[in-house]
Amino acid sequence: MAFYPLQIAGLVLGFFGLVGTIGTTLLPQWRVSAFIGSNIIIFERIWEGLWMNCIQQAMVTLQCKFYNSILALPPVLEAARALMCVAVALALVALIIGICGMKQLQCTGSSERVKAYLLGTSGVLFILTGIFVLIPVSWTANIIIRDFYDPTVHAGQKRELGGALFLGWATAAVLFIGGGLLCGYCCCNRKERWHRYPVPAYRVPQKDNQRNVTVPRKSSTSYV
């Protein structure tokens, strides 16, 4: 029970990481229209996400449309889709394993060792989820920044960083922290059990010639 707060904090952060991963995957604000040069259209904003693009007109009307073809999408978008879907699945599995490893739920019996390993596994999966979220978000941001400063790209085709990218970075940080706490609990639990049950000292067996031999005591009777 000494490390119970680490379990709670790690699982709570993991839950928020799962919610953030789902939000980052579904939100269309990965790429937003840039207002530079002659492209100053303040009454229309364009959002581009993994699954749809949206056009907001006059800050009131919002029209969204899913991408019609999967094969016609850019390879970067297809890779980002795949990585984010894997991230959602990993976060969900990690959360389920972490809940089963909690001390209050007797899913694993009374073995503290099994529970610690389950929470450690959950932490590793949360960290992997953070990596899977960080890769497509940072990759997309790098492409946006590169095209923004590329003079050969038309001003109407340039985009800026959307809110979903910032949400993805924050989600990756939360997943790293939550996974680190759960892995830390697993390590601390192993050290605690190591000190609680010290290794018994090794005793060298005695040889046969070193055994104690009882010598009969001589009688003290005096002969007259």
From Swiss-Prot:
Residue ranges crossing the lipid bilayer per the database entry: 8-28, 82-102, 125-145, 165-185
GO biological process per UniProt: calcium-independent cell-cell adhesion via plasma membrane cell-adhesion molecules; paracellular transport
Keyword Disulfide bond: no
One MF term in the entry's GO annotations: identical protein binding
Keyword Protein biosynthesis: no
Tissues expressed in: Expressed at high levels in the kidney and at mucher lower levels in the brain. In the kidney, expression gradually decreases from the proximal tubule downstream to the distal convoluted tubule. Expressed in the thin ascending limb of Henle's loop, as well as in the thick ascending limb of Henle's loop. In the distal convoluted tubules, expressed only in a few tubules. Not detected in the collecting duct. In the brain, expressed in blood vessels (at protein level).
Keywords on record: Cell junction, Cell membrane, Chloride, Chloride channel, Ion channel, Ion transport, Membrane, Tight junction, Transmembrane, Transmembrane helix, Transport
Segments on the Cytoplasmic face: 1-7, 103-124, 186-224
Entry membrane topology: Multi-pass membrane protein
Catalysed transformations (reactions): chloride(in) = chloride(out); hydrogencarbonate(in) = hydrogencarbonate(out); bromide(in) = bromide(out); iodide(out) = iodide(in)
Pfam families noted in UniProt: PMP22_Claudin (PF00822)
Stored InterPro entries: Claudin, Claudin_CS, PMP22/EMP/MP20/Claudin
Coiled-coil annotated residue ranges, if any: none
A GO CC term assigned to this protein in UniProt: chloride channel complex
Main location class: other
Residues exposed to the Extracellular side: 29-81, 146-164
Localisation: Cell junction, Tight junction; Cell membrane
Tree of life domain: Eukaryota
Known function: Channel-forming tight junction protein with selectivity for anions, including chloride and hydrogencarbonate, and for solutes smaller than 9 Angstrom in diameter. In the kidney proximal tubule, may be involved in quantitative reabsorption of filtered anions. Does not affect water permeability.
Family membership: Belongs to the claudin family.
Subunit structure: Does not form homotypic polymeric strands and it is not sufficient to form tight junctions by its own. Interacts with OCLN.
Protein name, as recorded: Claudin-17
